[in-house]
């Protein structure tokens, strides 16, 4: 059926007069979008909903709009009408000031009794001059430029422009303090006579009408460049596969306030201070950080000769989005276009080629096999010292005010077991602490508690897990009140806050999860404000080819430097995970962590200095950006790549996900002047990079039995890969909206609410995107069949592993509902797992042989898949899964009707 016929069959919808059968229609070129329009301007307006680009911004309040007429109406109603009222009030106040001066001079004339007639005539001339100057100052000043097609085309006042023109954008903002500011007279500063007289200045005809406004302008010029002269577009893109989940608290204002003090105000620029004084304001950042965005070459990676680096490259999310444009063009450039974009790429080194495989040592398979097995001296239980235990009890009783029954659970043996559980279970997934130099006796109690509570989470006792949640209600705020949280912030503070956030994501409490989403931007913003004098900056003096013996000081510097990289990379991983699973706005991009990848794990896990010095790392790992380019630009999928550690491979997957999310948002389309088809081609290259990553991961770690299939770390890697692939090819919001509409208790299987989602599902089910998503969903179900479903709740180190089951069930149910027209009833069977296993094997073999989906999918198998997935989700005690489990239950009840 053609699209034209589909429109003719719409029931109960009046056809437009302008549209007749046979007229040309303009179709949306975005994949899986079935919409078409009779007018081209309507199509362009619809395309902006895909791109979500708001190119028309208000010069007053920096609000952004997708249409120019809406911007014009906003300016007229919200600003110009108020501006006229404020101008009249300002004129009345200024006239009152002028007449006061006139009366004062008139009294002086009466007292002087000299040349009365001459002064009386001059009073009228003076009054006329005042009124004329007031009218010209308001009527002849050019208004601010509101209407521009692009946000970046707004004219900025030049240095030599008049003060009235340069401050026209601020002069229209009438504050309550305007009248008081208009009476302030700025004292004249002179190099020859720096003293300021205490006598009131004499008002003359030349300065009577200009001084009040110049004082107001100078007092408010500091806020005119709040965002460095660029508007905050406030682009909000719904990337959520699950739109009803709690979203992150918006922090665009908090993330952008970092740029407020990067440029000193005009008062500091005009006054000349003595040469011995610093002309930079106290609140401004160091010069080397203000130059980071314009000339970031020296900060692109940790230099081998001892240059300093900051934990995050960009000081704000706005700067991150700008640098992401150049990175995307550099990643996908090839041939002539590569030469064009590489000149502006800020992360170039002397050689952009990826080092070959023989330049890196092979992954120590014996170490990894030993590391991922819960045995060996690495996991020898250690006992907590009695002094640390007593200090911990006093700390809990004094700062947390725990009840006596809770304090009784903190025995010396239990604290030791919880610490050992952290090292054996959670350190494998988040290795941010250095085990060789970590000493319990010297660790801060807040950091120690964050480790202990993670170990308490693995307990099967509900009271112990409740105690851990009770501690976390105060632990974060207790760290905020520490002296170490102020600048310069200590490294252990960031490590403790990161572990707290991981704990809140693990717990099943909805309140704890929302706290993690709320305070995640706070952690990122605190890490952005780190300056080179803080503890987060170290020097790279370890790497090199010199044969000089290493010292203990160099080892500690290397540990600090590696700790900084790990906390930065893992915070970035959490941010990309929240964007993928929970639909939050990305606060970090891969450009923020443009650093070399993590060092080999056997270097990081060295027990002492002698072991580390014996296996001295002589070559630094490649940067994450160059490895991403290797995956994207690799023409032959089977070409060899450097063998990286499992943690670096997972970081590369997060980097690909960050690039994919940036392409989906289309933030940089107007500036880059690219077509949507080219952007879609780039998305296809990212999907091919996903597949390349999966083949490399299997060939390096799984096929050689280096990593066990059942390890939680491996499960999380495979889960993230399948989720990213499905996200790249499927709009899960449409699928879930359709599932909710089907379960709506209305007579009839198809209602007015299900027309649009059903049309998308039917179009999507007949494309190649559905085949890719089906393949990933089958792999997720295969992981489910390999696991042992227990009746007791499971508390492990997986964050988003359970979400894969719901996504896979949603994808397969939608395809079966759309392609299979037959309505067969499900046979009553006792062993659902075996029947689902046969169905998964059948569909997978058909896809490998190239058969179409409609020939192999069966709608009658949907209840079997939903039953098994619902049984698996009941094992994970997450409150966030409650609504999705309810959707599955409603689908099952709907199918049985």
Swiss-Prot record:
One of its GO terms (molecular function) is DNA-binding transcription factor activity, RNA polymerase II-specific. A zinc finger (C2H2-type) spans 26-50, 56-79, 93-119. One of its GO terms (cellular component) is nucleus. Keywords: Metal-binding, Nucleus, Repeat, Zinc, Zinc-finger. It is found in: Nucleus. InterPro entries: Transcription_factor_dom_fun, VerF-like, Znf_C2H2_sf, Znf_C2H2_type. Pfam families: Fungal_trans (PF04082), zf-C2H2 (PF00096). GO terms for biological process: DNA-templated transcription; positive regulation of transcription by RNA polymerase II; regulation of transcription by RNA polymerase II. This is Zinc finger protein zas1. It comes from Schizosaccharomyces pombe (strain 972 / ATCC 24843).
């Amino acid at each position: 059926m053609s699209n034209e016929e589909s429109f003719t069959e719409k029931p109960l919808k009046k056809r437009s007069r302008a549209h007749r059968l046979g007229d040309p229609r303009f179709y949306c070129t975005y994949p899986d979008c079935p919409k078409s329009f009779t007018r081209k301007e309507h199509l362009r307006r619809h395309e902006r909903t895909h791109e979500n680009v708001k190119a028309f911004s208000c010069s007053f309040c920096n609000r952004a709009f997708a249409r120019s007429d809406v911007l014009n109406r906003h300016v007229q109603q919200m600003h110009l009408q108020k501006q006229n009222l404020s101008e009249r009030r300002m004129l009345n106040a200024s006239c009152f000031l002028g007449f006061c001066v006139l009366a004062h001079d008139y009294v002086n004339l009466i007292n002087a009794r000299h040349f009365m007639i001459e002064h009386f005539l001059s009073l009228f001339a003076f009054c006329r001059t005042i009124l004329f100057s007031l009218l010209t100052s308001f009527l002849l000043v050019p208004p601010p430029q509101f209407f521009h097609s692009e946000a970046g085309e707004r004219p900025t006042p030049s240095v030599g422009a008049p003060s009235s023109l340069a401050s026209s954008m601020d002069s229209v903002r009438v504050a309550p303090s305007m009248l008081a500011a208009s009476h302030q007279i700025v004292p004249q500063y002179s190099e020859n006579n720096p003293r300021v007289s205490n006598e009131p200045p004499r008002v003359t005809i030349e300065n009577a009408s200009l001084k009040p406004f110049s004082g107001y302008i100078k007092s408010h010029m500091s806020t005119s460049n709040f965002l460095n002269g660029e508007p905050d577009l406030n682009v909000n893109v719904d990337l959520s596969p699950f739109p009803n989940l709690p979203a992150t608290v918006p922090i665009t204002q908090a993330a952008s306030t970092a740029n407020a003090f990067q440029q000193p105000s005009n008062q500091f620029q005009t006054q000349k201070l003595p040469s011995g004084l610093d002309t930079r304001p106290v609140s401004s950042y160091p010069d080397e950080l203000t130059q980071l965005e314009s000339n970031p070459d020296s900060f692109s990676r940790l230099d081998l000769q001892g240059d300093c680096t900051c934990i995050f490259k960009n000081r704000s999310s706005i700067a991150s989005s700008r640098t992401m444009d150049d990175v995307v063009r550099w990643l996908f450039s090839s041939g002539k276009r590569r030469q064009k974009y590489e000149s502006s790429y800020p992360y170039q080194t002397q050689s952009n080629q990826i080092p070959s495989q023989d330049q890196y040592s092979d992954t120590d398979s014996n170490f990894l096999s030993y590391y991922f097995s819960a045995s060996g001296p690495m996991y020898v239980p250690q006992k907590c010292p009695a002094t640390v235990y007593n200090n911990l009890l006093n700390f809990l009783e004094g700062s947390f005010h725990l009840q006596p029954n809770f304090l009784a659970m903190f025995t010396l043996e239990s604290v030791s077991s919880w610490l050992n559980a952290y090292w054996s279970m959670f350190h494998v997934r988040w290795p941010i602490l250095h085990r060789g130099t970590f000493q319990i006796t010297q660790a801060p109690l807040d950091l120690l508690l964050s480790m202990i509570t993670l170990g308490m989470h693995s307990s099967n006792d509900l009271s112990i897990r409740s105690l851990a949640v009770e501690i976390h209600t105060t632990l974060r705020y207790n760290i905020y009140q520490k002296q170490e949280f102020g600048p310069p912030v200590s490294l252990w503070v960031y490590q403790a806050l990161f572990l707290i956030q991981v704990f809140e994501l693990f717990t099943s409490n909805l309140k704890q999860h929302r706290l993690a989403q709320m305070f995640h931007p706070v952690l990122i913003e605190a890490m952005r404000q780190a300056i080179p004098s803080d503890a987060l900056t170290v020097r790279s003096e370890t790497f090199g080819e010199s044969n000089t013996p290493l010292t203990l000081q160099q080892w500690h510097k290397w540990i600090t430097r590696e700790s900084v990289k790990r906390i930065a990379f893992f915070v970035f991983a959490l941010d990309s995970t929240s964007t993928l699973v929970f639909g939050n706005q990305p606060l970090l991009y891969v450009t923020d962590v443009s650093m070399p990848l993590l060092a080999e794990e056997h270097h990081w896990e060295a027990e002492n200095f002698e072991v580390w010095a014996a296996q001295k790392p002589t070559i630094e790992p490649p940067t994450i950006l160059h490895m991403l380019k290797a995956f994207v630009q690799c023409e032959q999928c089977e070409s060899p790549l450097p063998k990286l550690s499992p943690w670096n491979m997972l970081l590369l997957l997060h980097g690909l996900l960050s690039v994919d999310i940036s392409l989906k948002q289309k933030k940089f389309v107007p500036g880059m002047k690219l077509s949507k088809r080219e952007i879609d081609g780039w998305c296809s290259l990212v999907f091919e990079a996903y597949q390349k990553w999966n083949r490399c991961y299997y060939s390096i770690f799984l096929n050689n039995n280096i990593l066990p299939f059942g390890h939680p770390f491996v499960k999380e890697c495979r889960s993230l890969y399948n989720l990213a692939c499905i996200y790249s090819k499927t709009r899960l919001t449409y699928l879930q909206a359709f599932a909710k509409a089907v379960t709506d208790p209305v007579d009839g299987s198809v209602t007015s609410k299900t027309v649009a989602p059903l049309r998308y599902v039917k179009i999507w089910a007949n494309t190649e995107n559905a085949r890719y998503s089906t393949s990933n969903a089958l792999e997720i179900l295969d992981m489910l069949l390999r696991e042992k479903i227990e009746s007791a709740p499971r508390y492990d180190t997986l964050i988003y592993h359970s979400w894969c089951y719901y996504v896979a069930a949603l994808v397969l149910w939608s395809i079966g509902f759309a392609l299979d027209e037959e309505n067969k009833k499900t046979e009553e069977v006792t062993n659902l797992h075996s029947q689902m296993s046969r169905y998964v094997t059948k569909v997978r073999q058909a896809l490998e042989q190239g058969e179409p989906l409609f020939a192999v999918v069966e709608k009658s198998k949907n209840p079997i898949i939903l039953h098994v997935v619902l049984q698996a989700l009941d094992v994970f005690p997450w409150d966030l899964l409650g609504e999705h489990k309810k959707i599955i239950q409603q689908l099952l009840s709907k199918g049985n009707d």
